[in-house]
């Protein structure tokens, strides 16, 4: 099961504003997945696993650092969930709070950006990952790209690979492509 906590556009805008000014929101937008609803083997019987993508969190905090704020950030997200689902906090047996700095440390993704490139209008759709590099082709003949840095982005799991493979098949059927 999936759920989002972002009841209005104004709510989402306020959540983003905090990050824009170097802090995290006291009422963040939360995109949550309860994976064990789909795959019960992920948790013991009667229990569940839930992942929350809490937006928006700046890489650099204006008045502190993520090592200091990590648990408070987690408390903030948990309080928002509790406000929408009373009793939620009593059900949490364990949590791990992962900040943008943690993502960068663990994976090498610059500033913890999981989208493999800014997810802004100039780098979306046929501009993803950059103008002239869309359609999964590269300037190197026979070399293609896919992943969260390509259309439609990392939020649509599996789609970049499917779409890239379809591009490869179309090019093979038509005689390939000769780079750009």
What spans do the regions from the language model cover?
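Mid-domain catalytic core of redox enzymes
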Residues: 1-43
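A glycine-rich dinucleotide-binding beta-alpha-beta segment and adjacent secondary-structure elements
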Residues: 23-33, 87-151
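Flexible loop/turn segments at secondary-structure boundaries
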Residues: 38-41, 58-61, 100-102, 151-154
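Short glycine/proline-enriched loop/turn "hinge" motifs that connect secondary-structure elements
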Residues: 40-47, 134-138
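Conserved FAD/dinucleotide-binding core of flavoprotein oxidoreductases
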Residues: 44-76, 80
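Hydrophobic, well-ordered secondary-structure elements that form the walls
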Residues: 52, 77, 81, 143, ...
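Active-site-proximal substrate-binding core of FAD-dependent oxidoreductases
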Residues: 93, 98-100, 169-180
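A conserved FAD-binding loop/helix module that cradles the flavin
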Residues: 148-169
